[in-house]
């Protein structure tokens, strides 16, 4: 039965029992969907029927998070696999693809940065990114790195030690730039170095980010000696300079262990009845090269299971080169052999998991545990501070209970062009980025030269709450949510009712929002306020004067954080949209390239920089591009010296940097 046409299974005991009987007692994965056919949760088991039945048999043993989830389940799907190991891999892929809301065990709000090398390109780029989007199976992400400042410094030094491509696009179409003249770039833009030799240089760079600096130094030392034996002193001096630069790079690493040949990851945690803080130390060739921290819901979970979930989460997100040959864990894992087999498959070489009890390895576990205890204390103090802020906000807005889910909205445009809006969500006083939403303003009245923030904000409110308006029209008691707390009555597939809606603006924006909510018949059901920038004043609907408040009181500070985050998110989306429009309009200037061909070119090459660097032969292989058009595109970006168009050259230099970097 289609989930979208049904009701929650808990309200239909007979249908629930029939559905549970249909599930086989085989290994595999299960997917729980709500009444809007959205995936709520993905899980795995070696016996699907008993595992899924456990969610509905003794619900008092479930955590509050899972109890809330089961109330929304309208359909259960399953995928049978040959083994539990296959189920683990499938579960990881399904979670990565669908990102179900209730699979968020790890509540770490950081998105750690990675270093990306685009090995699929003839002259690979190397850059820092927080988005792991594989454009090719050959591209590699190294990390994640907890200290983005150290990562930036390392990349800066690497580009000084090794001659690397310094720019995402050429500065000049027909000659090299200053970086080539001073030896910092090998002249990639004019193909002064072959693709094979450039890849060889980048393989050395990759060793730095794999924690193999000692091995690289040994290789460079041998290379320098070979050059010296052949009396190629210029090349030997260049390698000597690289060795000296590597010494500066390795000086940044925090600590070393006596066994300098071992690479391993070490996991330990500290926890109380509600919260767990997990630390993962990355040791490469005996040196600590990275440290990652996670917080998790610990209610009703054994410490070994928490560590296992962290392992599943972390290693499903990294490349095989980032999986070490050994993991040390503080507590035995419930499925340790399964985890070893899965990691071995990920790494394509044997991986062992140990729970050490004595000597040096146990000392290392103790060190990581001490760090976890500090992180647990810090997390609890942060929770207490956020709790005080939500209590103060409840008092300020005269709410019956502290708000759990708070939403903030903002508009961004330049005189009406590329108008967008943002929706950011704070849960328990902290950003919940998985719930953020971006909107493109659709109103034809808002365009370049014609802006209307009031109309834009009203449009977003209609689009955000129209499902709730439908539910109210069909008989749902939406008004009860205002007084009992949104999370208490989230049913029928609707689980995103906010306890507070905050608008960035003053009385004008607030009035426009309330008029839109009045059209939806929700104006009396939502708690709405606005925050004016100039004096940090809080306004409520129907009130001509702002609330009596201080800019530095905890509740107002929470609203300011929400407002600033909504503004940041809206501006970043606006810049992205404007950049994409500029790219499209730039390509549209080429004769014979219309809107559809622009779309096809960007889909094939992924960025305007790649189109600009492509040869005529490469361009001609793109869908819908023949030899003649390929030459026109190439000539547009590489005009001849005799007929250089100054305006085209100036426009070329004004192209936006690619967004993924």
UniProtKB/Swiss-Prot annotation:
GO biological process: one example: SOS response
Alphabetical UniProt keywords: Cytoplasm, DNA damage, DNA excision, DNA repair, Excision nuclease, SOS response
Residue stretches spanning the membrane: none
Bias type Basic and acidic residues, positions: 636-652
GIY-YIG domain: residues covered: 25-104
Subcellular location: Cytoplasm
CDD domains: GIY-YIG_UvrC_Cho
Principal subcellular localisation of the protein: cytoplasm
PROSITE patterns: GIY_YIG, UVR, UVRC
HAMAP family from the UniProt entry: UvrC
Subunit description: Interacts with UvrB in an incision complex.
Family: Belongs to the UvrC family.
Biological role: The UvrABC repair system catalyzes the recognition and processing of DNA lesions. UvrC both incises the 5' and 3' sides of the lesion. The N-terminal half is responsible for the 3' incision and the C-terminal half is responsible for the 5' incision.
Protein name: UvrABC system protein C
Species this protein is from: Synechococcus sp. (strain CC9605)
Taxonomic path: Bacteria, Bacillati, Cyanobacteriota, Cyanophyceae, Synechococcales
Gene name of this polypeptide: uvrC
């Amino acid at each position: 039965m289609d989930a979208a046409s049904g009701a929650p299974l808990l309200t239909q005991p007979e249908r629930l029992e029939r559905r549970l009987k249909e599930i086989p007692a085989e290994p595999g994965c299960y997917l729980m969907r709500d009444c809007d056919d959205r995936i709520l949760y993905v899980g795995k088991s070696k016996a699907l029927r008993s595992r899924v039945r456990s969610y509905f048999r003794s619900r008092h043993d479930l955590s509050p998070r899972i109890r809330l989830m089961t109330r929304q389940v309208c359909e259960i799907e399953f995928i049978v696999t040959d083994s539990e190991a296959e189920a683990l891999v499938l579960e990881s892929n399904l979670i990565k693809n669908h990102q179900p809301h209730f699979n968020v065990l790890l509540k770490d709000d950081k998105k750690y940065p990675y270093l990306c090398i685009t090995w699929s390109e003839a002259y690979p780029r190397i850059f820092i990114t927080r988005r792991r989007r594989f454009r090719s199976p050959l591209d590699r992400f190294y990390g994640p790195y907890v200290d983005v400042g150290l990562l930036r410094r390392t990349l800066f030094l690497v580009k000084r030690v090794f001659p690397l491509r310094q720019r995402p696009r050429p500065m000049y179409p027909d000659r090299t730039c200053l970086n080539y003249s001073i030896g910092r770039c090998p002249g990639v833009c004019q193909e002064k170095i072959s693709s094979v030799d450039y890849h060889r240089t980048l393989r050395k760079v990759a060793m730095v980010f794999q924690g193999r600096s000692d091995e690289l130094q040994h290789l460079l030392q041998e290379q320098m000696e070979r050059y010296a034996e052949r009396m190629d002193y210029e090349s030997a001096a260049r390698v000597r300079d690289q060795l000296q630069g590597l010494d500066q790079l390795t000086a940044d690493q925090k600590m070393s262990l006596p066994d300098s040949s071992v690479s391993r990851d070490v996991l330990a945690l500290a926890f109380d009845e509600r919260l767990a803080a997990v630390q993962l130390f990355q040791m490469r060739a005996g040196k600590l090269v990275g440290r990652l921290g996670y917080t998790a819901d610990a209610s009703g979970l054994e410490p070994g299971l928490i560590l296992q979930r962290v392992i599943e989460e972390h290693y499903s997100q990294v490349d095989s080169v980032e999986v070490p040959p050994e993991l040390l864990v503080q507590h035995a894992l419930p499925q340790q052999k399964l985890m070893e087999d899965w990691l071995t498959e990920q790494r394509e070489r044997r991986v062992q998991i140990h729970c050490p009890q004595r000597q040096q390895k146990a000392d290392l576990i103790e060190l990581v545990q001490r760090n976890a205890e500090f992180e647990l204390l810090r997390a609890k103090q942060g929770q207490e501070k956020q709790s005080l802020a939500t209590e103060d906000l409840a008092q300020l807005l005269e709410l019956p209970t502290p708000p759990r889910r708070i939403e903030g909205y903002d508009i961004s445009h330049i005189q009406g062009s590329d108008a967008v809006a943002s929706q950011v969500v704070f849960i328990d006083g902290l950003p919940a980025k998985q719930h953020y939403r971006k909107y493109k303003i659709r109103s034809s009245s808002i365009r370049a030269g014609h802006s209307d923030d009031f109309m834009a904000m009203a449009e977003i409110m209609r689009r955000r709450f129209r499902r709730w308006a439908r539910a109210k029209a069909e008989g749902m008691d939406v008004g009860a949510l205002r007084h009992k707390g949104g999370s208490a009555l989230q049913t029928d597939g609707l689980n995103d009712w906010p306890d507070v809606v905050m608008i960035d603006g003053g009385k004008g924006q607030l009035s426009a929002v309330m008029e839109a909510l009045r059209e939806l018949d929700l104006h009396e059901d939502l708690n709405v306020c606005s925050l004016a920038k100039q004096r940090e004043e809080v306004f409520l609907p129907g009130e001509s004067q702002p609330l009596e408040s201080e800019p530095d009181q905890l509740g107002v500070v929470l609203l300011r954080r929400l407002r600033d985050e909504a503004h940041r998110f809206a501006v970043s989306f606006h810049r992205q949209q404007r950049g994409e429009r500029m790219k499209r309009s730039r390509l549209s200037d080429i004769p014979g390239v219309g809107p559809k061909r622009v779309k096809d070119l960007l889909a094939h090459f992924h960025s305007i920089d790649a189109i600009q660097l492509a040869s005529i032969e490469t361009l001609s292989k793109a869908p819908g591009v023949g030899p003649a058009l390929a030459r026109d595109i190439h000539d547009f970006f590489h005009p001849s010296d005799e007929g250089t168009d100054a305006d085209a050259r100036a426009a070329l230099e004004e192209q936006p940097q690619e967004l993924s970097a």
